[in-house]
Regions:
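Inter-helical junctions in multi-pass inner-membrane proteins, predominant
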Residues: 52-62, 153, 192, 226, ...
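Hydrophobic alpha-helical segments embedded in the membrane of multi-pass proteins
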Residues: 66-76, 92-96, 121-125, 182-186, ...
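Membrane-helix/interface signature in polytopic inner-membrane proteins
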Residues: 187-227
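Transmembrane helix-bundle core of multi-pass membrane transporters
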Residues: 133-134, 138-195, 223-224, 243-249, ...
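Transmembrane alpha-helical segments in multi-pass inner-membrane proteins
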Residues: 233, 247-307
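Single transmembrane alpha-helix segments in multi-pass membrane proteins
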Residues: 41-50, 55-106, 131, 263-275, ...
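Membrane-interfacial amphipathic/re-entrant helices at transmembrane-helix boundaries
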Residues: 2-72, 110, 216, 224
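Alpha-helical transmembrane segments within multi-pass membrane transporters and channels
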Residues: 108-147, 183, 283-284
Length: 330
């Protein structure tokens, strides 16, 4: 009799555990789609508050045209964040890379693009070596290089802005820039989805020690990703030059903040890991662009916009942070 009762109790206990697991699994599945629903809510909200003005072809074009550089740079940042790391030097890196591109554009376009990419890659390499070899947290390293590079950018543009060659701004047409952006997105998606790189990034983000024990070359992977992300930002500098035509001391200012907000709007867990998805990039950047444009159209001042974006950022970090692990930013 006792054994039967124990069996029944065990069945009830296992059933309760299974029920809780099913609930957690359902909540996890719902959370996957929250960023997409969030984008639709943001779009719907501003469609109502602006009387549909935000959905006019002109404003849609303006939203998209302002997002090419951000979308491209976000690809590299996504890879870094998937490892549980951060890069606060993106804006300053873009400014320096853009200055390099503008200077060499006076001689040859292809050479200028390559020079900008190399400049970004070298900065990424410096960040990676200090972070990995010096065993210093990534956000500390990149905050230092952010200020350093901002100073370099200011020195370069002290007397006057660095202008790109006149033909560069003639490349500013929507089909070309959209095609380039889609190409970068596809290459990044395919590389991280169908090669070992994507698995390694998530493994490092989830548990760096376990990844090392599993045979993943953590240090080499981190260095490679920071270099690649730097190269991507260097290429984004070319897009920035096409849009603006010159570089000033404020080039790329606050880009790192925009990228971070975009990532969390897309559902990116701030500590990376297995829950990072490439859709974080596309949904996040589009959500940020619509949110920013909508706030401008509603007539909010810059200060109020920053306040709202800050509140949204805190809410998204709280929602998508993985509290089930003890991982911190590396």
């Amino acid at each position: 009799m006792d054994s039967k009762e124990m069996t029944l109790d065990q069945k009830e206990g296992s059933g309760e555990i299974r029920s809780r697991f099913d609930v957690l699994e359902t909540l996890s599945s719902i959370r996957k789609f929250l960023p997409f629903f969030g984008f639709l809510i943001i779009l719907g909200f501003f469609a109502i508050t602006t009387g549909g003005a935000i959905l006019t072809p002109k404003n849609i074009t303006l939203i998209l045209s302002g997002g090419y550089m951000l979308m491209i740079a976000a690809c590299g940042v996504w890879m870094i964040m998937t490892m549980g790391c951060l890069d606060f030097s993106q804006g300053s890196m873009l400014g320096v890379s853009c200055a390099v591109f503008c200077f060499f554009s006076q001689y040859n376009l292809i050479f200028a693009i390559v020079a900008g990419i190399i400049a970004g890659g070298l900065i990424g390499l410096i960040n990676a070596l200090i972070h990995v070899k010096g065993q210093i947290q990534s956000f500390v390293v990149t905050m230092c290089t952010m200020f350093l590079l901002r100073g370099v950018c200011a020195l370069i543009t002290t007397e006057s802005p660095v202008y790109a060659a006149s033909y560069v701004t003639k490349l500013n047409n929507m089909p070309l820039l959209m095609g380039i952006t889609i190409a970068v997105l596809l290459v990044t998606f395919i590389t991280t989805r169908f090669t070992a790189l994507g698995h390694n990034l998530k493994a490092i983000g989830a548990n760096e020690k376990a990844a090392r024990f599993a045979g993943i070359k953590v240090q080499k992977t981190k260095i490679a990703v920071y270099v690649v992300a730097g190269c991507i930002t260097g290429f984004a500098a070319f897009i920035n030059a096409v849009k603006v035509g010159s570089v000033t001391s404020t080039a790329g200012n606050m880009l790192e903040t925009q990228l971070l907000i975009a990532m969390v709007l897309g559902g990116m867990p701030i500590n990376g890991g297995a829950r990072a998805r490439f859709s974080n990039v596309v949904v996040g950047v589009l959500s940020y662009l619509v949110l920013q444009k909508g706030l401008v159209m509603m007539g909010f001042t810059t200060e109020v916009q920053q306040l709202i974006l800050g509140l949204v950022f805190i809410a998204m970090v709280a929602l998508f942070s993985d509290r089930g692990t003890n991982q911190v930013i590396k």
